[in-house]
């Protein structure tokens, strides 16, 4: 037998995906992080027209210039980030952008600071680059928000980067402006990289989103179209970085996939430049669902923070593994919080990217059959 590379032994296949493969397909799925809405019609039409125009060949490595220009305008308008199309790479989803960052900048034993809990792909990407994860606890008492003062305590001569994710998967936490700016200042003072995953930027309720790249140029900003425009299967995202970073990132991108999907790029352009009413409707619906699930869980005695963004809640639950197992047996899929870090071990992640009616049914099942 041919032995696999040692680096793959440091990670495992996603426990979330494994669980979905063995659960009852008729169960109510509160586990998956995917909008239950369809791609808006104007985006579908743009992609259909692209195929009719035979735009099915390679695009420039960085992506179509029209799309990169639209992304540049989006950064200026929404994020107060002044950039240009040459500093943008269109990627195969935000996931590729994250992997590119790790491969381009993380060396053996470099330390990367991560919020704990955080999206499980972050740790995997760091380990595949032979880096070392340094966790910073995000406490429930502070609504799971990452604090700059806690980050500062973890910085040393080996610190290479920090990954930020606001709004957060799995907690729905939205970082305060003061902490975003303070961490940006720390990146300048201590010369480390900020990788800012802003994929949930538009799915935000009672707060405002802030980008660290508005305060420091030691930042690679990652975003995409999967969550905001329900384009998960089309695998289209992007990143922005200063010129000296971009050349290294482009090496990984160029030899990995050459370019992002041409048809999806045309859809992405329409997403940014077309009407945004479907996004607003989706976010309003998510807010209603959040209010429902938070209220029901708290009524059941499961302490739950009122998430400010994304579409997840992270209730505190005694014996989460037993809860997840019993929930699945009764027809509701949830995810153990330990999948997202040591600090998530007393929690369960639930996604409200499911219909209002299904969430009501799921809460009734949990109340009767699990609680």
What residue ranges belong to the model's regions?
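Conserved donor sugar-nucleotide recognition element shared by glycan-biosynthetic enzymes
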Residues: 12-16, 64, 94-95, 144
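Conserved PLP-binding active-site segment in aminotransferase class I/II-type PLP enzymes
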Residues: 1-12, 63-66
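Short, Lys/Arg-rich amphipathic segments at extreme N-termini
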Residues: 6-24
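Conserved N-terminal alpha-helix of the aminotransferase class I/II PLP-enzyme fold
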Residues: 58-92
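Short, N-terminal intrinsically disordered low-complexity segments that are rich in Pro/Gly
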Residues: 9-12, 33, 37, 57
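N-terminal alpha-helical segment of soluble enzymes
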Residues: 49-55
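PLP-dependent class I/II
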Residues: 2-4, 21-23, 28, 32-49, ...
